[in-house]
Amino acid sequence: MRKTRRAALLLLAAIAGPALAGPARFSDFRYDGRAQEQVTPGPDDYRNPILSGYYPDPSITRVGDTYYLVNSSFAHYPGLPVFRSSDMVHWRQIGNAIDRPDQFDFSGLRSSRGMFAPDISFHDELFYLVGTCVDCGGNFVMTAKDAAGPWSKPHWLPFEGIDPSIYWEGERAFIVNNRAPAEPPRYEGHRAIWVQEFDWRTLTMTGGSTQIVNGGVDIRQKPAWIEGPHLLKREGFYYLIAAEGGTGDQHSEVVFRARDLRGPFTPYAGNPILSQRSLAPARPHPVTSAGHAKLVQTQAGDWWATFLATRPYGPDLYNIGRETFLLPVAWRDGWPHILEAGKTIPYAAKRPPLPVCDIDAPPTSGDFAYRDRFDGPRLSMDWIGLRTPKAPLYRLEAGALVLDGTTALGDLSGAPAFVGRRQQHHVATISTDLTYRPETEGDRAGLAAVQSDRSFLFFGVTRKDGKPQLALMVREDSDHDRLVAAAPIDPAKPLRLTIALDGGTARFAYGVDGRETVLARDVDIRFLSTHEAGGFVGTVVGPYAWSARVTRPISN
């Protein structure tokens, strides 16, 4: 009987095959970043950018004495981060408008599709958020009683294009957005701005659409990609501000005005009202690609603009994405001015004349460091992954982040077991402790730095040729990994993984029993830049795990 039982157990083991990979356990995640430009703001100054790293396409609104801001998030989840501030300098993230899988489905989307250019506004005790889910449903509106959420599921809006924005006038509302022109496009990038009334009580469009700008400031000059429009009214004029030139180094902000909401709109003779494209590219620590602005009036009557811009470390090279900046707006001769032509965007400027508050909020600008011990009930809201998960990707237990992954980075069919934080500085050191034993060929767990589905790196533990090893692998706008460096390791011992980033290069080191060894130094990581990888996002860095066979499901 005992022999029969033993034989049965051996047969079962043979059928089951080799032992499966256990989960990866990460602890003590640390980030320490500093700006390449060393600026010392004065006591009455603030620092640009106000939101460092991948926080593009800012939309701002004021409710009483409080300001709210939302950014694009593309195919990252949770998405559409929402911030609150009382002084427009110290910002605290209070939620993500997309924080439930049943709101949107990002399955099959590449990292730079999904959530484009949201706009936030407030009316009759309700917040409104309009945006575009590119390749996943089109234009939509969501509502919430509290900007922190919960936000509703999307109500889909039946018009094409991107970048919708709501303009409120009394009890009426209008949506302005980028669409195809009324005529056949004359050139690449020929777009138009349209306006249509929005019934905010039923969340539906009403009446006909009117094209109010065709092409841009001067269609004879073939202006490209007029987008990101916003309307406001001042002293009897309707003002339309919009981005022009595409969200690269030719980006700009332009303005038009009209006596009637449906036009005709006249462009300002002094356009653009914001751009850095005429400045010398080789200037020290440049700010480039400025545009996609939205204006807000303070309770004291002053005007300010939030907008996106970038901080390249080389010729149009930036890994951290497009960031949120702030500048005052001056009105002269009936037109708004954000920055005079030929002037550089300042890294430090006089702060808005508002009461300084919330100075204990987690820093979003300048040099800063943080540490996550994973000892809370959930990850903080600034951790993000790729695409909407069909099931939970992680669990937190005993001060550790636990990952079991069945979808690999680069596989668009699902959400990889990757959770990360935005890289917010070109000079940064990121580290974590890892405990992991790979059992199946190709199993891996470690740190990943992800710019796109075809451009990322992995630094961690894997199994190759039947043996565990530490490996640095890169994918450079490709569907295949390239091994950069490897070293044998003992998987029974916890590892300290450290990535030190410095612009377009990086150093990779690991620690065992308190001793650090450099695996690779001066590694070229320019492939993580937007210029090389393409798209609209910034690099996200964090724990990642993958196995073809998973021992247990994630439970929470």
PLM regions and their residue ranges:
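N-terminal export leaders
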Residues: 4-10
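Carbohydrate-active catalytic/glycan-binding domains of CAZyme proteins
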Residues: 1-2, 20-556
